[in-house]
Amino acid sequence: MWTEEAAATAEARESGIRNKSSSSSQIPVVGVVTEDNEAQGVFKPMDLNRVIKLLEETDKDGLEEKQLKFVKKLVQCFQNGLPLRDLAQIFKILNLCAGKIKNQPRFVESAYDIIKLCSLPFLKKKVSDEITYAEDTANSIALLGDLMKIPSSELRIQICKCIVDFYHAEPPKKHIPGYQQASSSYKIQMAEVGGLAKTMVQSITLLEHQLVEKLWVLKVLQHLSTSEVNCTIMMKAQAASGICTHLNDPDPSGQLLFRSSEILWNLLEKSSKEEVIQQLSNLECLLALKEVFTNLFMRGFSHYDRQLRNDILVITTIIAQNPEAPMIECGFTKDLILFATFNEVKSQNLLVKGLKLSNSYEDFELKKLLFNVIVILCKDLPTVQLLIDGKVILALFTYVKKPEKQKIMGWSAAQHEELQLHAIATLSSVAPLLIEEYMSCQGNARVLAFLEWCESEDPFFSHGNSFHGTGGRGNKFAQMRYSLRLLRAMVYLEDETVNTDLCEKGTIQQMIGIFKNIISKPNEKEEAIVLEIQSDILLILSGLCENHIQRKEIFGTEGVDIVLHVMKTDPRKLQSGLGYNLLLFSTLDSIWCCILGCYPSEDYFLEREGIFLLLDVLALNQKKFCNLILGIMVEFCDNPKTAAHVNAWQGKKDQTAASLLIKLWRKEEKELGVKRDKNGKIIDTKKPLFTSFQEEHKIIPLPANCPSIAVMDVSENIRAKIYAILGKLDFENLPGLSAEDFVTLCVIHRYLDFKIGEIWNEIYEEIKLEKLRPVTIDKKALEAITTASENVGKMVASLQSEIIESQARQDVQNEQKVYAKIQATHKQRELANKSWENFLARTSNAKTLKKAKRLQEKAIEASRYHKRPQNAVFHGTDIKGLNTTVPSGGVVTVESTPARLVGGPLADTDIALKKLPIRGGALQRVKAVEIVDAPKKSIPT
């Protein structure tokens, strides 16, 4: 806020005042001359206690001269700095001198000289001195603020100069042996500890008509307010209101306004903002701010004045956030509205007659600040009439149109774009409060026409240089974004006049067209803003179509297609943080408002596997979506075609929809703290649905129009929705359920019975608490209902036990089958191992081989048919030269030496081929060979 130019201007003015003050002062300057040059860097020994004792004495001849002489010696002694160890005594001497000023004016000079010493560095002999003498130092510096009560202009100015020098520390002029300078921030810290800021704030009230001293005090407070500690102290001392009420005090230099605004800024930033706003929210402060702002607005032409004007407006905007601030009563609201609109809507008001804003940076910022303050002011409903009188809607709509080639109102293209976006954003807050004015300005038509331009291919290079222009550089996304926000705000008023007008102008078709156009041209660079635009379009469509069948029919299959497109979004993107979650919420809302209740749209949604997509999202197990999706599915289940789609769905690991819903039920009960055993079985048959919340909060009598805890539980969790869906799917024919699912399903099936019993139990308990005695018949009925509810719980628990036991038996049987299969596998492996051992024995031992051969031949012979039929052809079982110990035949495969090494299993036999190619190594088969003298034989069939 404090720019270099402003600072230079202020310092120049301050310098003039300082020179003037110095010239008018009658106090002679004491020149300290040291007699011994070698001793300049060494403190002369001085008994400070003697000086104090001397100053405390009274009624002696020549005492005043002696006292003044000793004080002068003290000043000479400490001309290069003040040791921390002596600081308490030096300030006690200063206090004694100040006490004598009223009756002995000559002590003004002594006090002045000692105060001047405070501008010198504080010196420490030990490193620990800063800590050791911290309390004495803080109390000493605090004394400077108390001395502001002395009615001496010179002393007050010197005190202020001394404090300002704390923030501009200079090294000591001479090095003092044995001493070193305290840290540069030590004085500032001690000023905070001593509470100097409080006494300086209080001193403002003593300087009502002393402009020079007041400016110096403000300069001190300006420096002090750079610290959060000091700002807190100043805030508690009511500095904000005290300074603000004097903003309009006469000051030719202009420093008063500049320094005051700087202090107010620091107080708002570095102390309790709410408390400072509360201090400024009074009629006197607001009138002062109003007068200052109006004067600067009408007569401020320099860069410095315009910047100061904007700073005052920002402070005013912050105050306006307090609904208790009398902005309307002081007339400030009316003036601000006038200043915000006079460029767009011509006014004959004398305040703005002949005024014109330039395209300078300060005036451009002013325009944006005025738009912003309108948004703040419109939150106070009494402001509405002033907004109507000021024609704010009409003024803002002058920006809602495509840019023209010539400059508009002198703004550059970049400035106009930013103001355009700011104006549309302001309309989003103001227009919903002024529906009649919005409609009289043809607001819907203007916005829709502007959206057409946003969607068109007209050449346009946006600058995107502002907060509102984020994501819109080189395109029209920013304009489209804020226009859709405006439409969304108007649609969600649920005003039938506005919504009907929108539908008659083809808004539904236009929104669908914009959406389809956006998804046809993916833009990953501006993905976040594109997602926001898509979300707003879906919300607008939801607001227009809700409870209107005809509008849902207009939404139709094209609308369903864009919904399905969003539903197919990669689930991993939901965690990206770009806005996919919001888009999915908007999509689910549009399913509820635009599709449900319109049978053609419902059927088309089902045909395009919309239920599958809903269940896919539900399977992601994200709690924020579950409630809404289940509510949609409850409504969809009224369509007779839905059940088949739900039952046909399969998730990961072949999970069915019924299994998914039951899993969600178990998860919900776990979060609610419902008591179940490890198998999911009911523990308390009297309270089978009780949550931990219901257990903690005892039943209390409630009025008849207040729902009880049991009733509220129905709407506050998803159990009722799951019960409704499974009921419509038929509890008896749910596919893909495990035993655990069936145990849970027993509870779900009886949910309504349990809930009714729970409510009757609440009624019974309330009667007891109110000490009412029902008649005998009613009492018996209540007891019968309670008993029946408990019996249902016992029956369900019994059924759950049967299911658990049956599953346990089934598990045992399955385990036995698996064990039998394992045994068979082991036995087969043993037989294979034994066969392999026999094979190894035959191939490694000739006797064993011969024995096996004999056994083979014997087995073959035993298997022969002994009565041979006539004309039968005899086939030998042996092939000569075949060295195998297994039955030979055309389909026998023997795992032995590879065929490529031995020439095949028949290479050495009598029926081997007569001509074989020699390729080196073993004999190889060939595809075509000529058989020599091969007898032709008929093959028996």
Curated annotation (Swiss-Prot):
Disordered: annotated span: 1-23
Principal localisation: other
InterPro entries reported in the protein's UniProt record: ARM-like, ARM-type_fold, CFA69, CFA69_ARM_dom
Keyword terms of this UniProt record: Cell projection, Cilium, Differentiation, Flagellum, Olfaction, Sensory transduction, Spermatogenesis
A single Gene Ontology CC term: sperm midpiece
Subcellular localization, as worded in the UniProt entry: Cell projection, Cilium; Cell projection, Cilium, Flagellum
Domain of life: Eukaryota
Xref: Gene3D superfamilies: Leucine-rich Repeat Variant (1.25.10.10)
Transmembrane segments: none
Chain intervals with Low complexity compositional bias: 1-10
An example Gene Ontology biological process: response to odorant
Role according to the record: Cilium- and flagellum-associated protein. In the olfactory epithelium, regulates the speed of activation and termination of the odor response and thus contributes to the robustness of olfactory transduction pathways. Required for sperm flagellum assembly and stability.
Protein name in UniProt: Cilia- and flagella-associated protein 69
Species the sequence originates in: Papio anubis
Lineage, opening ranks: Eukaryota, Metazoa, Chordata, Craniata, Vertebrata
